Amino acid sequence: ACNRDLKFRFLLERSQALGFDYLATGHYVRLQAPEGQPTDNDPGTQSSALSPQHSVLSTQSSALSPQHSAFRLFRAADAAKDQSYVLYMLQQSELARLQFPLGALTKPEVRALSRERGLITADRPESQDICFIPDNDYRRFLREEMPASIRPGPIVHSETGSVLGQHNGLPLYTVGQRRGLGLTSHEPLFVTSLDTDSNTLIVGPSEAVLRRTLHAAGVSLVSGAWPAEPFRCLAQVRAHAQAVPAQVFPEAPGSLRVEFEQPQRALTPGQAVVLYEGDEVLGGGRITRSE
């Protein structure tokens, strides 16, 4: 929500109201302009060598416009700092007014350039705080700001159905979590799902966390076109996870089903699934359920 609604939508609207042509951010991601269209973005990021001329989406469906007529988004040159996963929702109208000057640089290069220019941020420690939660303690934030959402309830074993204990509130847990459950068991137990209807935390053995299929809603595709046929690509389900082979099945507009070649761990509702072809960002959406 921070990137979508504040850093981009609000700031783009504000910059346009102030008469600026572009908004530049420090995100590590590369942007390529349509063929023949000049861009003020970092010149090192605009090479056609970034990826094949047409993406998998344009070759899989005739209903899609060819990618060389649209802005295209790519992973950063510095793979360790790449932030493309959190920018999948950017639209063509937004990309046309954005610049990402750090996309072709590594973090050490950025620090060196900052020192040369005497910027106070040159040696500032990196921050990965949650937006608007400076201490990064989202559990404290929820308890203080949304106490009604923190309701204790049962912890149930996914295979036996037995009640193992009591949780402290579903928003305080995440799929795949092992520590902090407050359980004593002869086997390691992990959160496999959260049943919000019954306020029940479901736990089970490690293999119970594996899923092969996810469903996603609120899907946004960088090209702006919607595929008419299934297509193969790479799918990434966490910010620092590896993108892995999958097949994508378009459903209703804005919804997708993603089937992985291999079972994946902790496909968590609420997290994003982002689709790639090589380094190119195709789009993504919010995971609603997995199976």
Each language-model region and where it sits:
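Nucleotide-activated chemistry modules centered on ATP-dependent adenylation/adenylyltransferase
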Residues: A1-G44, H68-L282, R286-S290
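Intrinsically disordered, low-complexity repeat regions of secreted/extracellular protein precursors
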Residues: Q46-H68
